[in-house]
């Protein structure tokens, strides 16, 4: 797993994310689906869009459950997360409409983040999982149709400081704590012992975001490319961010490996994967002077905050793809012709209702194929980038190699599933 994360994030995920972002910039901020239309044709775009939309619905449903479960297990994180939303709106208005400088706004915003965390610890919000799922569905509907500058962008920006702090604390804690792994480093290439789902190819479709994830291509081309100040920032944002995610994935492996055994099963049952990660990293942070309760709550808050950004971003992307699917182009003028289904409110409502229904449990039916579907998105995105690079006379070997590998592992995985 560790080798796949290290090799994958550098030679696969980084190339994939940067390639999708850079090609979108060169296509005037168009989505990866529109790039596929230009490089592989309308049929290719249609199939990709259907595939991507269903995948996004599963992402929204799954992450809604993950965030809701985290809020139930860590109610203080729920309070702080709601306060973050209010803080993001105030930050967006202050910077973009009232002329507050970014530097001053950042200092005030980070201080208010700490205040929100403190308030969350004092006033934890206890609600059931189903109630939280309903609240999250309302939130993502509003967030996905609101202008990017008022919520999505400031919220992600302020949340990034939580992530930087969490990674820094985790790495320092690991260095001082020097944890020993409670799980065996290797058992067999067929852990189940049944001849099914062996390490190859299942490892490469199970460990995704820390190595390579097709979802990233949708984000890079759907929202990120439209927010860059200059093309020169694409490498740091597209490639660099993937490397940072690789670091976070390494921390996750260490945390899970340290927890291990029976405690791992118990934590998974009472709070899910976020609970396991928070418990492990929270333990490491005790070496930095934090109490275990405060440290675990902080880590749970950080992860739930980023899971919520995934929720609203995935909903916005789902709306984009839904609108593209039902937008017709006038063959004479080449202009897009909208209809009721391409209305932002209608497209968002349909996306939220479908994912909300799936979050009640039906998404679990197709969840086993999600990993392979996500990685197949990555392979298709790399194919589109590779074809585009070839069409403009640029070398595309660094894209074709990871593309071929991802096609191989995903198709074998789908055949086994």
What positions do the PLM features span?
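Hydrophobic, membrane-embedded alpha-helices of multi-pass small-molecule transporters
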Residues: 129-146, 172-179, 189-231, 235-240, ...
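Hydrophobic, small-residue-rich membrane helices and short re-entrant helix-turn-helix hairpins
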Residues: 32, 146-163, 215-248, 268-269, ...
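Transmembrane helix-loop boundary segments of multi-pass membrane transporters
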Residues: 5-9, 51, 62-82, 100-105, ...
């Amino acid at each position: 797993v560790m080798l796949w994360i290290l090799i994958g994030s550098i030679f696969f995920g980084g190339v994939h994310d940067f390639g999708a972002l850079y090609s979108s910039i060169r296509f005037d901020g168009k989505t990866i689906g529109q790039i596929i239309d230009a490089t592989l044709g309308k049929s290719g775009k249609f199939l990709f869009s259907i595939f991507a939309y269903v995948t996004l619905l599963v992402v929204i449903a799954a992450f809604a459950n993950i965030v809701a479960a985290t809020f139930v297990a860590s109610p203080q994180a729920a309070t702080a997360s709601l306060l973050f939303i209010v803080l993001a709106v105030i930050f967006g208005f202050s910077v973009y409409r009232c002329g507050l400088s970014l530097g001053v706004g950042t200092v005030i915003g980070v201080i208010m983040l700490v205040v929100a965390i403190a308030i969350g610890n004092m006033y934890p919000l206890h609600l059931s999982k189903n109630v939280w799922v309903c609240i999250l569905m309302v939130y993502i509907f509003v967030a996905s149709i609101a202008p990017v500058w008022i919520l999505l962008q400031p919220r992600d920006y302020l949340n990034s400081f939580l992530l930087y702090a969490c990674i820094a604390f985790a790495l320092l804690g690991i260095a001082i704590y020097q944890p020993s792994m409670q799980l065996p480093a290797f058992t067999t290439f067929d852990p189940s012992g049944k001849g099914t789902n062996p390490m190859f190819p299942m490892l490469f479709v199970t460990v995704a975001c820390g190595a390579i994830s097709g979802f990233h291509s949708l984000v890079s081309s759907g929202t990120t490319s439209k927010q860059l100040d200059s093309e020169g920032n694409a490498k740091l944002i597209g490639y660099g961010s993937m490397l940072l995610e690789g670091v976070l994935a390494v921390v996750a492996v260490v945390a899970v490996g340290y927890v291990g055994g029976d405690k791992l099963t118990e934590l998974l049952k009472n709070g899910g994967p976020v609970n396991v990660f928070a418990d492990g990293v929270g333990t490491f942070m005790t070496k930095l002077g934090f109490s275990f309760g405060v440290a675990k709550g902080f880590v749970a808050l950080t992860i739930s905050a980023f899971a919520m950004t995934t929720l609203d971003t995935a909903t916005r992307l789902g709306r984009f793809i839904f609108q593209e699917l039902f937008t017709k182009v006038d063959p004479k003028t080449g202009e897009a012709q909208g209809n009721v289904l391409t209305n932002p409110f209608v497209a968002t409502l349909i996306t939220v209702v479908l994912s909300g229904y799936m979050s009640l449990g039906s998404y679990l039916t197709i969840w086993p194929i999600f990993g392979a579907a996500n990685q197949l998105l990555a392979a298709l995105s790399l194919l589109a980038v590779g074809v585009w690079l070839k069409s403009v006379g640029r070398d595309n070997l660094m894209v074709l190699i990871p593309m071929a590998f991802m096609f191989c592992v995903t198709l074998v995985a789908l055949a086994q599933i």
